[in-house]
């Protein structure tokens, strides 16, 4: 397996020169492949997904060159990367990590397979016609998470909590879906949701400060916010307000806990779909969108963080945890 991470300008130059040697995309007959990876931004959850995706090819014994590009959170860069991959005849398949990256890639890449991961609502993001029958050249794995169970953690550690704050990027469709789910779950749990919208990670500090007075903070799988999680965690500890996350990696970075998916396993599931497309000739249009097996969801708690937030995790909850993180 080979990894090639070209500077974006160099990659664009290659495309502009028209160096488009024909690949053998999806035929199942090629002995080696080139896979482009369009990742929205770097943070542990998305990096874990990328790692798991590549691991699937190792396990399958395929000879693959990965061309990895990171848009650093810039949608214009997502589009440029996607266009480069679309015009590069050597690229057999494109992987897209996170909803904005998947949307930009699907818009630009029409004649080769696209496999997404870290996308909460594929149909709502207009990536597929339906989960069961995607219908085009795009399929992948959703990271839809159990929002109600995650918010329940706040009630478990702070039973008198009545409000929860959520900072999210208004430009990320996946985040809006989770906020709507949080509002519905909040009605059942007795939690009023207070929102603060941002447009990029540099606004997270201002956004979280606008949530003054809430009893807890919920961090959805919003890439702008997760990439600046330490800002949210720092505010939570300063104000003694517990921070609950939607992803496991954020617990290791200081959130109190979550009930969520393993992003490396999530990425590997997407990688296995890509292997089916390249090695076996499977058609994305006929590969149903994948979801995490509920049995594989993990309860991960950080008792040290809980203490910093001024709350204690009940012993019964600790006993049920799949993992206790210290730090």
Language-model region placement:
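Beta-alpha junction/loop-to-helix N-cap segments that form part of ligand/metal-binding clefts
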Residues: 68-129, 222-237, 241
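Hydrophobic alpha-helical segments within soluble ligand-binding/sensing domains
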Residues: 122-163, 262-282
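Extracytoplasmic "Venus flytrap"
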Residues: 32-54, 60, 67-77, 171-175, ...
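C-terminal motif of bacterial Sec signal peptides marking the signal peptidase cleavage site
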Residues: 18-21
